[in-house]
Regions:
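PAPS-dependent sulfotransferase catalytic core
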Residues: 1-91, 101-113, 117-133
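A short acidic, amphipathic alpha-helical/loop segment
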Residues: 95-98
């Protein structure tokens, strides 16, 4: 689902020069998509239109530079908290050093979303089954 208000804000605003105040990482099937949805409804929080930028885990995206990452935050207000949700940051060891490098002066808060492993595995099985995989 596309948030049209967010799309309008991003299309006419200059790129952001701010890094996120917080990152949310976590296990698959641990409600990161739901959290992203609810946080986008809060007027004091700004999240990228796409939930997972994959910037710190994807070699091609990372090679495009920090400016490419900051483009995802175009339209953030001065008073808004800036965040990103990407579960994969928890699994890719290189992401930690990349985040540490770029956030050296102002480390973000990092929120981990976890779920009971048995319930998570069953939920993943059901999703895979529904998709016919």
């Amino acid at each position: 689902m596309v948030d049209l208000a967010m799309t309008d804000r991003q299309s006419s605003a200059p790129p952001s020069s701010r890094l996120p105040d917080f990152l949310v990482v976590g296990a698959q099937k641990s409600a990161t998509t739901s959290l992203h949805h609810y946080l986008t409804l809060h007027p004091e929080i700004f999240l990228p239109q796409i939930k997972e930028t994959k910037f710190f885990v994807d070699e091609q995206r990372y090679a495009q530079g920090i400016g490419h990452y900051l483009d995802h935050f175009t339209g953030v207000g001065d008073q808004q908290r800036l965040g990103e949700i990407d579960p994969d940051y928890m699994y890719f060891s290189e992401a930690v050093s990349r985040i540490r490098h770029h956030f050296a002066d102002a480390p973000p808060k990092i929120v981990f979303l976890l779920r009971d492993p048995v319930k998570r595995a069953f939920s993943h099985y059901l999703m895979t089954y529904r998709r016919g995989l």
